[in-house]
């Protein structure tokens, strides 16, 4: 998935005939593959999670039709959501994990060192500033802030030039304002049947070709605090310019979705040469119930400089949790 299907499939079941002595054969070279292509990745726009659900449904129905067990490899992830296992996609995968003779394995993502996540604790009458560095020639950017719906927070935004807009209180619909050459859309989300936390969504759109570079600040001004915990995520590092990141990142809670589903096997990456966990590999904790938290990933597999087949022929070295999943 996401443009590396050939390499992932070769790790799982490649015959190794293109290498001397078959040294680069896959983990299970005699196994049969059922390939589902979702489409090409897009730089702009939301991930196609509904297409992923359709793909999983197709594979499970075929496995039942053929009366064969199936291991589903999902080398795909995104950062859009509360990361609590409560979205429609995550719950769907949890349900499908109980269907037929199946196991669903998902990569934990490569956001561990991307500086794309931060978090904190709100306190009444105490303003908090979250600093975000934006590199030059960044064509667009969005930021998610997730908090308890019972906490009430006003938002201000300070641009690289020092211009401040806000505080902006919650209201229905999208609020628009402009700082320099960047238009900002701010949306306060509402609870849903799948999500009781609130998302505050920021969309940075250039009035020209690129949004203003430099240090942006998102200012949180609490009006009422009950739980106080907030989390913030950027898009995956693969769609951002290098260096666009939170200036005070938090490396916990860097799992990508849907590896946050509780019943899937979440696979992290380790370096098979040094036997150390890969620093880029996502990690985090999911709340199983009021008294128990489950740590993810569930296990780790080789995911650093893995030699596997390339699309078009030959072999190459690849790193990432996408390449750890097919080992499982």
List PLM regions with ranges.
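Loop-rich non-cytosolic ectodomains and luminal regions
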Residues: 1-328
């Amino acid at each position: 998935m996401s443009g590396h299907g050939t390499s992932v499939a070769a790790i799982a079941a490649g015959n190794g005939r293109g290498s001397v002595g078959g040294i680069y054969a896959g983990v299970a070279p005699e196994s049969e593959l059922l390939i589902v292509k979702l489409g090409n990745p897009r730089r702009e726009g939301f991930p196609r999670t509904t297409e992923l659900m359709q793909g999983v449904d197709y594979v499970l129905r075929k496995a039942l039709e053929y009366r064969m067990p199936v291991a589903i490899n999902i080398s795909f992830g995104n950062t859009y959501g509360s990361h609590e296992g409560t979205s429609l996609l995550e719950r769907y995968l949890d349900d499908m994990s109980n269907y037929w003779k199946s196991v669903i394995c998902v990569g934990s993502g490569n956001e561990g060192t991307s500086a794309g996540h931060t978090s904190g604790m709100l306190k009444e009458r105490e303003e908090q500033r979250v600093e975000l560095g934006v590199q030059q020639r960044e064509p667009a950017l969005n930021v998610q802030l997730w908090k308890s719906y019972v906490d009430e927070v006003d938002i201000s935004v300070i641009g690289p030039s020092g211009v401040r807009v806000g505080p902006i209180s919650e209201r229905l619909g999208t609020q628009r304002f402009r700082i320099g050459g960047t238009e900002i859309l701010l949306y306060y989300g509402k609870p849903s049947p799948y999500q009781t936390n609130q998302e505050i969504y920021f969309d940075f759109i250039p009035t020209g070709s690129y949004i203003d570079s430099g240090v942006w600040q998102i200012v949180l001004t609490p009006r009422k605090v009950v739980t106080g915990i907030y989390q913030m995520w950027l898009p995956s590092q693969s769609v951002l310019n290098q260096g666009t990141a939170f200036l005070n990142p938090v490396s916990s809670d860097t799992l990508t979705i849907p590896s946050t589903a509780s019943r899937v096997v979440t696979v992290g990456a380790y370096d098979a040469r040094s036997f150390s966990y890969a620093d880029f590999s996502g990690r985090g904790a999911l709340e199983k119930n009021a008294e128990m938290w489950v740590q993810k990933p569930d296990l780790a597999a080789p995911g650093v400089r893995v030699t596997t087949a390339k699309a078009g022929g030959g072999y190459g070295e690849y790193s990432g949790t996408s390449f750890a999943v097919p080992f499982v």
